[in-house]
Amino acid sequence: MQTEIQSSSLRHHPYRRARLPRSDEETRASLTEQHPLLPDCDHADYHNVSSVRGLPCAAGFTLLQEFPVPWDMILTPEEIKILKRCMSVCLCPATLDLVRAQMVSGYERWILHCHCSSPGSLQCRAGGTLLAVWFRRVIYGCMFNQRFPWYRQIVNRNMPKEIMYMGSVFMRGRHLIYCRIWYDGHVGSIIPNMSFGWSALNYGLLNNMVIMCCTYCENMAEIRMRCCARRTRRLMLKAVGIIVRETCDPDPICSSRTEPRRQRLLRALMERHRPILFSEYESVRSSHSTRL
C-alpha cells in the first residue's frame, strides 16, 4: 500500500526527474507559418470532451480564461505520436467562463475541447480522457508560480501593460514562460522583428500569448531561475523597444500601476486561499504612472 502511494505521488509530482531529451525540432513564434503540430483554435467546430479542476497556483491563467499549451514542448515522442494519429487538438485546448461566478477561488474547472470530425465516438472520448491526464500534469506544473513568487516580480517590474509576464509551467525539466501582448497591432510589430527562441504564438480569442520554453533552469536551482528571469525580462524590454519604435501612439508607454496589486491578490490566493473578485482584478486596465 505504501509503495502504491509513493508511486502515485511520484507520478503526479511536477518536479520529478523524468527529463525529456533535447528536442531537434524547435519551433519559433510566427505570424505567417502555422504550428507544425498544433493549429490555431477554430471556435466554429470544437466540442467539449472533458474537464480538469484547477489549483490556486494556476490562478494567473484562470483570470485569463484561456490556457494555451504547446504540447510538442512537454510531451514524450511516444505521446506526440498518439497526439498526431489519434487526436485533433489545437494550441489552446482549455477555456473557462468567469462571467457567471465573478470570483476566483483557484479551483475552477477547465473545459477541454477537441476538433475531431466524430464527436462522441469512442476514439474522441478516449482522446478526451488522455487529454485530461496531460492537462492535469500541466496544472501541477503551475506549482512553479507558488514556489517562485518572486519570478513575476522580477520580470514585470515597471513593465507596461502592453506586454506582461503572466505565469509559468514547469514540467519534465521544461520551463514554459507565458507572456501576453495586449494589442493585436503590437503582435504584428513584435513577432516579425525579434526572436523569442524556442517559442509558440497563440493568437487567441481573448489573449495574444507568446509561450517560450527554457531548458537552462531544468534543475530548478535558484541562481539559474534568477538568470532565466533576467533573460525573460531582457526579451520583453526588447519587445517594448520595438513597440515604441514602430507604433505612432500619442500616449506614452508607462509602467502598469495595476501589476503590483495583482501580484498581491495572486499571492494572497496561493498562500492564504483568499478568493479574488474578477471585477477587482480587472478594475483598472490603464497603465499610467511611471514613464519607461
Swiss-Prot record:
One of its GO terms (cellular component) is host cell nucleus. It is found in: Host nucleus; Host cytoplasm. Keywords: Early protein, Host cytoplasm, Host nucleus. It holds the Pfam family Adeno_E4_34. InterPro entries: Adenovirus_E4_30/34 (IPR007615). Plays a major role to prevent cellular inhibition of viral genome replication by nuclear bodies. Assembles an SCF-like E3 ubiquitin ligase complex based on the cellular proteins ELOB, ELOC, CUL5 and RBX1, in cooperation with viral E1B-55K. This viral RING-type ligase ubiquitinates cellular substrates prior to proteasomal degradation: p53/TP53, LIG4, MRE11-RAD50-NBS1 (MRN) complex, ITGA3, DAXX and BLM. Belongs to the adenoviridae E4 30 to 34 kDa protein family. Interacts with E1B-55k. This is Early E4 34 kDa protein. It comes from Human adenovirus D serotype 9 (HAdV-9).
